């Protein structure tokens, strides 16, 4: 329970800090075309800073000031992994299926891999590492289950 509370507070703090740091997008009109993804979906073209969506603050912060967005992503990944472990710890099959979701992390990593910004590189590394960690956990649960049942590994 302490882990959830701590991770939740880290998530809330890093979300507020990311939102604040990302508000810098409002004073950089040359970046609106590349970082105001949600605003362009909502309004079409952006003519002034009041057209910028609050969600675009997070995109801008993730691209150019990635410390707090990375902390935000790490804390939510930790909460999801902790919840998955807690829900699936009694059933090895469910546990393996949960961590087999590592493919989603690799897909996310591949989606941001082409980003020319420092934040894109950091998020690629984060998602690829989380995917590798999840795959390793799935492999370890399979190996542990086979060894526990006394099966020979092939």
Where are these regions (language model features)?
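Hydrophobic cores of alpha-helical transmembrane segments in multi-pass inner/ER membrane proteins
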Residues: 4-11, 75-79, 129-144
